[in-house]
């Protein structure tokens, strides 16, 4: 990524060497011995992170302020299920999490089989719930942040137009080929 994304000043490139790891092959599972962030405490959170991170530009909490960040999602505004959580100022975490002290209703994903890679199904589903409640305009609370997290403005526009995940992904194919 350092070369491909142009991270070095003056369009410099660095010479990179891939060193094969003995006894490991692509596809082998691996569990990090140390959590990469207080908000990514386990393999489940790490696996769900790509799909849940874009919620940070919306009215939906990703569970910051709980002991299960990026494993629970919800909002005080909707009641998708009886599952609820209450973000609080926990030691070693954000002192002011979204919806601090309020019950959020949504999904417990702690034992859910996470999608392989990035999925828009959760974002699309929650957006549709807000739209059904007549609150579509309240869903993207930080639209520029959402756009930055997903890489462009087009995805947000496609979601608000009612496109399916498959239709949105199809638009990426040309760029991937």
What do the predicted segments below correspond to?
Residues 68-173:
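Conserved functional hotspot residues or short segments at active or partner-binding sites
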